[in-house]
Swiss-Prot record:
Source species, domain of life: Viruses
Biological role: Involved in postreplicative transcription elongation on intermediate and late genes.
InterPro entries: Chordopox_G2
A Pfam family the protein falls into: Chordopox_G2
Name of this chain's protein: Late transcription elongation factor OPG087
Family: Belongs to the orthopoxvirus OPG087 family.
Lineage: Viruses, Varidnaviria, Bamfordvirae, Nucleocytoviricota, Pokkesviricetes
Subunit annotation: Interacts with H5 and A18. Might be part of a transcription complex composed at least of OPG087, OPG145, and OPG110.
Name of the coding gene: OPG087
Species in which this protein is naturally found: Monkeypox virus
Keywords from the UniProt entry: Early protein, Elongation factor, Protein biosynthesis
Amino acid sequence: MPFRDLILFNLSKFLLTEDEESLEIVSSLCRGFEISYDDLISYFPDRKYHKYISKVFEHVDLSEELSMEFHDTTLRDLVYLRLYKYSKYIRPCYKLGDNLKGIVVIKDRNIYIREANDDLIEYLLKEYTPQIYTYSNERVPIAGSKLILCGFSQVTFMAYTTSHITTNKKVDVLVSKKCIDELVDPINYQILQNLFDKGSGTINKILRKIFYSVTGGQTP
């Protein structure tokens, strides 16, 4: 594992979160491997980062012992950093009235309804006729489905990224600890790959490179 990846990972973490432990690690590694300020800013050319990078060389406390390997939690940390201060929302569909309440999962011709009021059920029966669609009492998988949310203000990142969501009010996309735990599950590798591949900007590009280094893939 290249020591530069370890430096760039911890520096990215410091630049995003101002984590002091990461600053100490970067400072110690740079002193040990004679990495200069100019070396670091070549990876972070945006001027907004430069005053923070200078702190690496002003830091007095250095680590006496350093691991030259990524920790077991590195993948989780990468996902956390990639989604740090993630801010997205879903615009409401004005075809859905404010009076509708409930959750509907539609996959193929199967429909699962939860916590729906009479207005939503009436709407569904008009739009999705029982002659064509099957209304099921069993849960329908959210992944790859159409999700209708009515009367909710938040939805998980996992639901947002794996389904097509329509809502009757503005819905914020929430990244929770549970969501990150689900994302690092090996069965969701493709979702992670898409997440890192879509990232733009200096830090996201670095995180993408380290993601492929940690998971053994090849950076596109």
